[in-house]
Every structure is written in structure tokens, then in C-alpha cells.
UniProtKB/Swiss-Prot annotation:
Reactions catalysed: tRNA(Lys) + L-lysine + ATP = L-lysyl-tRNA(Lys) + AMP + diphosphate
Membership in a protein family: Belongs to the class-II aminoacyl-tRNA synthetase family.
Protein's name according to its UniProt entry: Lysine--tRNA ligase
Enzyme class: ligase
UniProt cofactor(s): Mg(2+)
Gene name tied to this protein: lysS
Amino acid sequence: MHKKNYMQQLSEQEQIRRDKLTAIRKAGINPYPADLFPVDHTTTGIKENFEEGKNVVIAGRLMSRRIQGKASFAELQDSKGRIQVYFNRDEICTGEDKSKYNDLYKKLLDIGDFIGIEGELFKTQVGEMTVMVKDFHLLSKALRPLPLPKTDKEGNTHDGFNDPEQRYRQRYADLAVNPKVKEIFVKRTKLFNAMRNFFNEREYFEVETPILQSIPGGAAARPFVTHHNALDIPLYLRIANELYLKRLIVGGFDGVYEFSKNFRNEGMDRTHNPEFTAMEIYVAYKDYNWMMEFTEQLLEHCAEAVNGTTDATFGEHKINFKAPYKRLSMTDAIIEYTGFDITGKSEKELYEAAKGMDIEVDDTMGKGKLIDEIFGEKCEGKFIQPTFITDYPKEMSPLCKEHRDNPELTERFELMVCGKEIANAYSELNDPLDQRERFEEQLKLSEKGDDEAMFIDNDFLRSLEYGMPPTSGLGIGMDRLIMFLTNKQSIQEVLFFPQMKPEKKAVELSEEEKEVFKLLKNDSVHELNDIKEQSGLSNKKWDKAVKGLRKHKMIDVFKEGETLNMKIS
């Protein structure tokens, strides 16, 4: 973008800040110094260990101020919180030269600027802990005003930075002005730390496996595809890390886990982002019954670490992560909520049953997919408290061991909370011949048109042929789990930078177009002639402005009876 065009798009406030930046530089002050600033206290540290008269060095954003002549109260925000600071001209400028206060502080600083303060602690007459500023330093000049809320005389807040799309696109501004948002991500880190500590105490080994894979295995999902130029081969972004972790069990590790970034080229909604974080753990010589108890203990531990209690609220639901959790087989769950028994049913019978339940199905779906659709539509949403759904049909679980008591089923469970799956676990299939047959069944589904069927991974099959001990594996969706622990209904609230649709390019308006659009902001529908009269534009300029706004799809012009009206689109 040309500098001239960019400058034309600046708001009045942005232009004023740039003018101040120029004045700061002319005064010989570097608005972006490279020097270390020797911070020795935080806002919360000061409040927790307050000592009258103590000298402190703090730094952060200037968030508010009230200037009263040669004195000013302000508020400084650092990563921990906020504290009141008191600027007094004669405390800061002890000699004849008062320009640091009169010019730099009063005229050239703005809300949002980063400053460093050297000062002394005291309490005001009303008992508020405050820093008396002895000296201050500009550390970074903010050229764009923060979207801070305004508070009226009655204490009501207006113009808060609440629009979700803007908050997600500009998370940096969201974090700066909405302190509660930062709490979500502090809890997210607590969750990861708690889980990692739980595993490490049991001497399980944290590992890293490839994100770029030649075969996207370990889950039924559509992958992102890229191309490696040097090798001239397609590569896929990881959809799961399961097959690599199992290779490590083959290699001799008794327990391995990984927090992995996974990618699925599928739809986005309140619980799905194309890039997400999963945790997978595999433990040798265990089965899915052991893993259920392990999962209960793990989630109880994590809930306590994040919130200090096993109780959690999610929307209208009160849930409790204290072990033990209810257990119900998938067959029994479907019988309970539909009256239909899936046992021994053919693909055609399952298809007809699903159609009879008004479930959208098609000819590409095999038995596993059909059962999954029935359960998802009719049962999944019923499980509010943590519930293990166990013993899935074999067709749904190509990497899972056959059930020890029923060859039609597998030793698998999913943990449901508030109608959503947050964990998935198996007694892992370690028979290489059985595994090859399962992969070949998936290949048939792929040829039938199922774009989520698994690829055949011959190297993984080769690893199984060397022998893998009995193993149980668990996968947990970390984003979804933290949603439940922080009562957030959208996955976008728990990701720093969620995937968004491309941002619409800012429209450059002429002065006449701006004037017309400004007049339309007052109400919903306006008579065209009234707006034309208020604008004071000539017929030629009016026609050009309205034509431009309609071209940009910013306004609608329409007729009601004999009257021409207009409104913002």
C-alpha cells in the first residue's frame, strides 16, 4: 500500500498519535528504546506485600488518567493486573525544567502507551495502594487507540470490545482490554501443566512425532495436502499421531505421550477448528478397563488443578469430574434412546433404520458410519455428566482390538460430557494380520466414496510385525476439555488465534460517500430526499456518492409506495 493512501485511511486519533510521535522524536526522546528496563515488581506483588515508602520499579500500559494541573492520577496495567500511580510535576521534575511532566506526560503520552516507572509506595486518603512516581520513561508509543470501554457517571459500561469476530481477529487488543480473557488462557496453561505432571509422576515419556506425514493415519478425517518440492511427493498435515506413538511402543517404551497440533480439512463450527490440540498417551501391558480408571483419575486431577474443584459449569449444566464415571455400552445406549438394537444388523438394515429415524445418510456410508450417525443424532446429546460409552462395533474402530467376549465389537470407549466427546480410548490392535484386513476394509470404503476412510500404512504394519505388547491408548481433545473447564461455548474463545474467514478489505470512501453514510447511521430507514437535503450535496455529487455506496454494497435504496427510502445494508 502506498504511504499516501495509507495516511488517508488513518482516523483522526491515529493521525494525532503520529503527530505526537514526531514531536517526541524532535524532543530527542526515543519512543522505542532498546535498553533493558529494570523491572523489579509486579502490580500484584506490590499489593500482596505492600510496604509504605518502599521503592519499586514497574512497567506496563497506561490505561487511564486524570490530569489536574501539576498532578495526575493514572492507572498502569502489567501482565498481572492494574495499580494506581500518582504523577506530581515537582516530584518528577525537581529542577527548573518542568518539560518532562508538562510536555511529555501531559501532552505527548496517550492511553495504551507502555511506560516504565520508578517510584515509592504510599496509600491515598481513601486507602488505595498507589505508586508515587519519582521518574518515568516512555518504552513504546502506541499509534492506535485501544478499544477501551467507557464508563458513565452511573457506573454503566458502554462501547466495550465485545464483538466476537473483532475480538478473535484482534486477540492482542482483546487481551489488553478484557482481563477475563487472559484468565481463560492462564487456565489453559494450568491444564497442560497438570496433565504433564500427572504423566511425568508415573514416568511416562513425552515425545514429538512428525507433523508432515507421507500417509495421514490414526483417524478418520480429511487431511490437508501439500507438496514437498525437493522430494517431489505429496505430504499431509497430521490428522493424528497415533501410529507414530505405537511405533515407539514397538521400540520398547512402556509409556509415551504427546501434546500434538492436528489438522483436519473439514468444516468449522463452535466446537471444531481446522487446527486443534490433542493429547495422546499409550501405555504398554494395559487394557481399556485400566484406561477408564486412569482417565477418571486424570480428569479429576486436572479439574482440581485448573479450578480448585471437580465441579464445573457449562452453560445451563452443572457437571462433576469426580471419579468414578457412569459406563454404558454403545449398543445399550442406542437401544435406550431409539429402541433399535444394532446387534447383527446388515448395512442395508442399518441404512433403513437410520432413514426411518429421519437421519441424513447416503450410499457411501458403511456399517460403522451408519451406526456413528445413529448414535450421534439420537444419543450423544443425552450424556451430560461424564459418561463412558463402551464396546463400539468393529466397523467403527479399525485400529482397535476385537472385544474379548464378542467378535462383533471392539474394546473401545469414548468419554462424553455435555453431549460431546472429549476422550477416545482403545485396547490397541496389535495383531498385524488383523490390522491389515481392517485397513483393506477401509480401502474399500474409500473406493466407495468415503473421503474420511483411513489410508493403508505399510510401514506401520511392518512395525507391528516386529511385535507390539498389549497396549492401551487414550486421546483427549484439549481445546474441548478447556471449554468445559472455563464454561466457554465456542472453541474460538479458548484458542489465542482461531481460524477466521478472510477479513474483508477496508473500503475507501470519498468524502461525499462518507458524509451520506454518516447521516444514515442515526436510524434504520430514511427517506432518500431527507438525507439528500441534509447532505447539502449537488445533484451530481449526490448521485455519484449514492452510486458508490451501492456499488460497495453498503446501502440499500428501495421504494415504499410513492416514497424512495434508503438504509444501511
